[in-house]
């Protein structure tokens, strides 16, 4: 059995993530008490027919003592020979505040004595151990419902028993991607932004590709990053990592980082490497 545990702070998209997996054939259970995970796994694996793919939502509504016992529960699942992975969804505090304000929903940990901001912070503390153990952390701050569903489908539901690689372009001016495992800075490359005729375009457009391809530094940077990824990707896989996100950043995240990400994806796919591409700022 493959057991996918979906956790994360309220408002980060856990329900959307579970629904996406359910649409892909997963047997889904939301808000299950942590202590019941081994029992559920045993019942479903021994069913007739046994259920092979299960997704369970775990959140801060569990008792604090159960959340503290999470490591012991994972050990019990391992003893049952259940393959488990943890997907943790999160978003920055401002985004969570905005989402709750927009929907006017009450936070699960909110009380008359605890403000929404305090509830969001308290939830982070309660789930810190689960986040630390996560195989994949998804920052949904810049995702809408549709892109989050697509991400879950491509990176989790359809993933074979191999490492899932994502290449992500971003702009440093908007902060580092919180889900990045490796970060490459390509701001040393010539910047199309300073050419007024090129500024409106992105690294996917022919004029930007032509501009950056004229500079040897672009080819050297692309080769060096590609060599690093190809060299060390097997090491990540051999260390039981299920997910790796390689983030490539420039100043605004629209020209140089997009160009390098697109070209790197093309080269890696030619090597037979399966991957997903995301451009955070586009």
UniProtKB/Swiss-Prot annotation:
Residue sites binding GTP per the record: 59-62
Entry binding sites for ATP: 8-15
Top-rank lineage group of the source organism: Bacteria
GTP-binding in keyword set: yes
GO terms, molecular function: ATP binding; GTP binding
Keyword Nucleotide-binding part of the UniProt annotation: yes
Keywords, alphabetical: ATP-binding, GTP-binding, Nucleotide-binding
Family: Belongs to the RapZ-like family.
Function: Displays ATPase and GTPase activities.
PANTHER family linked to this entry: RNASE ADAPTER PROTEIN RAPZ
Name this protein carries in UniProt: Nucleotide-binding protein ABO_0549
Originating species: Alcanivorax borkumensis (strain ATCC 700651 / DSM 11573 / NCIMB 13689 / SK2)
